Amino acid sequence: MITLNFIWNSNEIFFSLLGINIRYYSLMFVVAFSLGWYLTKKIYLNEGKTVEQLDSLFIYTAIATLVGARLGDCLFYNWDYFQHHLLEIFLPIKEKPGGGWELTGFSGLASHGAAIGIILAMFLYIRKYKDMKLSWVLDRIVIPITIGGMFVRFGNFFNSEIVGKVVSNTFPLGVKFVQGEDLSTYKAMSITGANTAKEAYYQIVHNPQYADILAAIPYRHPAQLYEAAGYFVLFWVLWYVYWKTDKRNKPYYIFGLFLVRSASWWNS
């Protein structure tokens, strides 16, 4: 059998600017927001809405997404850590073990928190524009949100996070996530004696001395790529429903399609 499985040890940093690391994950968010604005503009202009209303929606959505996703990760998933590092919730820094602070950027974001944040923000948005109903807004913003979800999952893949279940070495699509949950940064640096995580993982992959360590890392489903493909398909379904059918006039219909499909992924 021909297999496509491979070892994934990506450099999550796209480039550095003035000492600040720009990560692929952050880049994917920029792409998602930019494309989302463009797609929503087509929808808004099609329905006679103004650019002012569009720009306002973009601001509400962007802030709600980032704040909601950040708080969701900190409060729902990593509160044991952040309750002792409250400043790190709001600032892109991390406390060094030996004292002091390191500028790291925000790395923890949760889609559940983003979803809650966006819905709450839409309540504020429709209070500003009395001619809009919540159902109308939600039915339309989930379309660009869906394609945005695809790019966010690409970012998760670059970060080696949200990995899938373990598969056999012969599974055609298996991926060995070297920087995933099976080999912590601390353990990799301890084994190799490297001074940085990047160097430690490089040694694990390329130095024959650590071949047994590399072999012990299991292949896993690339769940991020599966979900990215699913979001891509769902986007075209919702796009078709909006532009080619009259279902867009049925309150919460498109939003409901989005929820049903997305909920099945979140629970899988």
What name fits each language-model region?
Residues M1-S268:
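A feature for loop-to-transmembrane-helix boundaries and adjacent hydrophobic helices
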